[in-house]
Amino acid sequence: MLLKTMTALGVLAGVLCAQNTRPEAGPFNASHLDMQPPPAQGVAVRAGRLFDPKSGKNLVNQVILIQGDRIADVGPAERVAIPQGARVIDLSRATVLPGLIDRHVHLIQDAQVNDGRAALTGLNYALKDLSAGFTTLQDMGSAFSYATVELRDAINKGLVPGPRLQVAGPQINPRGANYYPAPSAAMPFGLNTGYNNWQNTGNVNSPWLARAAVRDRSHYGVDWIKIYETEDYEGGGYPGQGGGAFTPDGKMINVPSLTLEENQAIVDEAHRRGLKVACHAYGGEGLRNCLEAGVDLPIHIIVGVTGAAGLDDETIRLLKKPMADGKPRQVQQTLWDLIGDLEERDLKASGGRATRFQLSEKSFKRLVAEGLEEVFGSGAYTVGHGMQAFQFGYFVKWGMTPAQALRMATSNAAEGLNFDLGRQVGIVEKGRFADLVAVAGDPLTDITETERVKFVMKGGVVFRNELK
């Protein structure tokens, strides 16, 4: 019955568009769903090639044994015996990868009439991502209350199918931030559902109100806190026509949203409650504030803390400073919101001197050269879900090896997830969740294979199989 109901969502009609346009997937294709629970005897997957993020190589002729939702064993076919009665899935002509992880999506960005509609809208986008091979998603802030928390819990309870989720709930911005329509409207921590603005993010005007915002989100059960640290689309308003992010002489405008003290309060309160903090900052003082406050994941990083193109030594020093727990800080750069009409607008605003996309390329290359660990986050929102993998091609074009690009969405991405989820996904090994993806070709020789996922398994359940 579930399959029949979901089939009504539509037929997949995604078409990859040309460079500098935003590719968009059609409705989720529920006809791909298998949804058969693994038999008591387990499942055996024959993998012709198995990508190993640790070595960056393909292991050939492998067998993956699955019991319930976990990997029971994995290794060469001559060592791993297939139990009698096990369901055998033959992917001997394909490349199998760990389930992909997208550490930056927005499942609910449109105004919704109520929380129920918001959750169903988010489910539709989450299923597109799952069908494309992304078995774990991190929602980096979705407006209109805490519907993503309810969606996460419904998936975990098996009420609806979907990827694994970690969610941030409503983003944190100060009152009067540029995402509000003018005049600014005071709203209690994003709970005004249906209000016609891009995101309801609160009334944070002091360190104590910043702590209160974190406590509120913790009460509702989020996994992460998301800060909007720079009002990066200043100069016309995103996504309105005519907006720009540059001065006429080509300098990027990055207005800090919060003070250092407010950031420190957010990070301290979040860490006290076992939550991690992600910070949207394109550069300048806002990026510096985030890093000095100790955020777990800085996002975007288009220019340096001084506003320098290609970053500067001070930015690299702050990024390399170990976290409070002694671990190195990961970084994330998204391309989604930089591809499309923003190129033309940025060129116009900067007098033809720069675009955010061009600056992102320079910064990406510097971060990789400095040895900082990049994690994949597409930035997909109301368009783009299910089409994220095209971004891997840019990373390879910018100097990464295909193996490095794949690590961004597997082992690297897993490592920074909150709680213990990171130790259960991202690598195909004994004891981890049986989250698998397969493509017909070899992404180590053609990274665009990731755009043509043919097989998806999450927790031992097949959600898509075009390799039968």
Per-region residue spans from a language model:
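Acidic, glycine-enriched loop/beta-strand segments at the rims
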Residues: 32-35, 50-63, 76-77, 401-406, ...
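Boundary at the C-terminal end of the N-terminal hydrophobic targeting segment
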Residues: 18, 23-25
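Glycine-enriched alpha-helix->loop->beta-strand junction motifs that scaffold or abut catalytic
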Residues: 291-298, 323-330, 371-373, 400
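Divalent-metal coordination cores built from histidine and acidic residues
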Residues: 31, 91-111, 116-251, 255-275, ...
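His/Asp/Glu-enriched, well-ordered alpha-helical/loop segment
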Residues: 272, 356-443
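Histidine/acidic-residue-rich catalytic or RNA/ligand-binding cores of hydrolases
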Residues: 111-114, 148-149, 179, 236-238, ...
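Bacterial N-terminal signal peptides
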Residues: 4-15
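Histidine-rich, glycine-flanked metal-binding segment
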Residues: 27-30, 35-41, 50, 56-97
